[in-house]
Design a protein with these regions (language model features):
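Core catalytic lobe of class I
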Residues: 2-196
Length: 196
């Protein structure tokens, strides 16, 4: 019968103690970025930017690759979140207080959002006529350009971003398994379809 070993401690320290090509299977659920603060110095998931978090995750997975046998597999559980201000503070207040960009409101890592092409920013076009008020609203004809920002309430797509970062580092992403949770925590947002 095969022995199962559970290693507890800092992931980078525990992985460095392990020999190359010694693990058949890794099952991991690393801390999701910006969602839990365990009040522990250097904790994974509390990096100032998503780019720093993804860089750290790729570095950790390089150590996992080193200890994984050529026939080994990795099972990764990584959750998502929505772009919002933490604890009700605005993005500007949070950044001013702690130089922290985990609010997602003004981060240059997404290709969606309100970053507009200045060449089109001043032109406007009619959008909708309101027969009750007699007013015609206008909208900017500016175009969103690559390098834009996530908007409030956007799904951040963190698992996808991590999967792409790992693919870029040479990992294979073989499948995505949706974890159906029949008794999941209720979603009180009221502005989006529940994910379960």
């Amino acid at each position: 019968m095969m022995a199962v070993v559970i290693r507890v401690g800092d992931v980078t320290e525990r992985l460095r103690e392990m020999p190359d090509d010694s693990v058949d299977c890794v099952i991991t659920s690393p801390p999701y970025w910006g969602l839990r603060d365990y009040d522990c110095p250097g904790q994974v998931g509390m990096e100032s930017t998503l780019a720093e978090h993804l860089t750290l995750m790729v570095e950790i997975f390089e150590e996992i690759r080193r200890v994984l046998k050529p026939t080994g597999t990795v099972w990764l559980n990584y959750g998502d979140c929505y772009a919002t201000a933490p604890n009700g503070r605005s993005a500007a207040d949070t950044k001013a207080a702690v130089a922290d960009d985990r609010t997602f409101r003004d981060k240059p890592f997404s290709t969606v959002g309100p970053m507009l092409d200045p060449a089109h920013a001043k032109s406007v076009r009619p959008r909708a006529f309101n027969p009750i008020t007699g007013n015609t609203r206008t909208e900017s004809a500016a175009r969103v350009v690559a390098g834009g920002y996530l908007k409030p309430k956007d799904l951040c797509m963190l698992p996808n971003r991590l999967a792409i970062a790992l693919q870029d580092a040479g990992w294979w992403v073989r499948s995505e398994i949706i974890w159906g949770k029949p008794n999941a925590m209720p979603d009180s947002s009221g502005t989006r379809r529940p994910s379960t």
